[in-house]
């Protein structure tokens, strides 16, 4: 995930001002958690962002998923870029991209930019997006530091129930509905 400077500055300023920080700051992990909350629940109230972040943390704690926030969010099949394929390059110099619509969180492999567009093309700040991003960062920091009420129990899944009903949802139990998302566990 590429971090833009305005998004990074918001992350840095908020993380340094939160009272009661209990863990060392891992900006990359917090950024991944905040980006997921932003893209999955940006138009929802604060509790929606908290709930989405809690699902990610539940997955990190589970033996069924990777044990880092960024790995949970980016989990799924990847393919090598045509720009590096077939060339004699070491693995670390090759570029890989998620396969469209085949990852755990739809925004990560939808084919659109994953940059937080705080700055407009004219250079001015888009305050609506900036405020949604600030809420997402704040939610991520609180959840990362376990400073929130548990809204989702042990849920490791959710979906936007007003838009889709995935096949896997029929095999799971519903824990709660928060705004546009239905939170599930098995």
Regions picked out by a protein language model, each given a short descriptive name:
Residues 12, 18-186:
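Bacterial extracytoplasmic/cell-wall-associated proteins, especially those involved in peptidoglycan
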Residues 3-13:
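Sec-dependent N-terminal signal peptides
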